[in-house]
Amino acid sequence: MPLHKVPVGLWKRLRLREGIYSRLPAHYLRSLEEARTPTPVHFRPHGAKFKINPKNGQRERVEDVPIPVHYPPESQLGLWGGEGWLKGHRYVNNDKFSKRVKKVWKPQLFQRELYSEILDTRFTVTVTMRTLDLIDEAYGFDFYILKTPKEDLCSKFGMDLKRGMLLRLARQDPQLHPDDPERRAAIYDKYKAFVIPEAEAEWVGLTLDEAVEKQRLLEEKDPVPLFKVYVEELVEQLQQQALSEPAVVQKRANRT
């Protein structure tokens, strides 16, 4: 007899159907459920279920087993390109007959200054060589942030940048190069393929706790008094009535 009525692996998904979680926007809940497999970084996938053994020529079954990666809190403040810490063991003095001790492999980190066209800001970010290569492949820092999915960014800082970029693109913010409208229009046209509604952009990159807090604040807004609603409706009706009625022009008497 099973210990739990529902498997433990489904608890997080079922929690989204109850309480305030169920009232989160549909597009945000969909982004949680449609989690994709991250791009392999620390191992090379076989790309097939079977391979030929070069020694005996027999077909053997192979399986892609991802290496467990640990992402420290520092990785959320930079852009590591999916790299993290690998925990394992090594032999003392590279001698297999010696004692085996624990070892942690860490990526090499660099401090680089990256410029965002959309935000018109320079950021000093901790990056890896893989991140710089990915930025070059994407033809720019903004393209890298906008194109890379959440599972491959592996960075809270990167997702916050993406939310800021999407909000500026959705609002067509005139504060971007206010003295050069042609340059501003060229930038917005360059990234127009990534434009999404502002209501969706506000939720991009939020953790579940942040999304719940945002939803709670939206629901706890002070209600608008009814007299204000009625006054606004009355003003609109009077304005429409004034526009629909023909204007009467009185002629002045000619002085002799």
Curated annotation (Swiss-Prot):
Keywords associated with the record: Mitochondrion, Ribonucleoprotein, Ribosomal protein, Transit peptide
GO CC entries: mitochondrial inner membrane; mitochondrial large ribosomal subunit; mitochondrial ribosome
Taxonomic superkingdom: Eukaryota
Transit peptide, UniProt annotation: 1-55
One function term, GO molecular function aspect: structural constituent of ribosome
InterPro entries with a match to the protein in the record: Ribosomal_bL28, Ribosomal_bL28/bL31-like_sf, Ribosomal_bL28_sf
Location within or outside the cell: Mitochondrion
A Pfam entry, by short name: Ribosomal_L28
Main location per the UniProt record: mitochondrion
Protein's UniProt keywords contain Ribonucleoprotein: yes
Subunit structure comment from the entry: Component of the mitochondrial ribosome large subunit (39S) which comprises a 16S rRNA and about 50 distinct proteins. Interacts with OXA1L.
Family affiliation: Belongs to the bacterial ribosomal protein bL28 family.
Descriptive protein name: Large ribosomal subunit protein bL28m
Organism: Bos taurus (Bovine)
Recorded name of the encoding gene: MRPL28
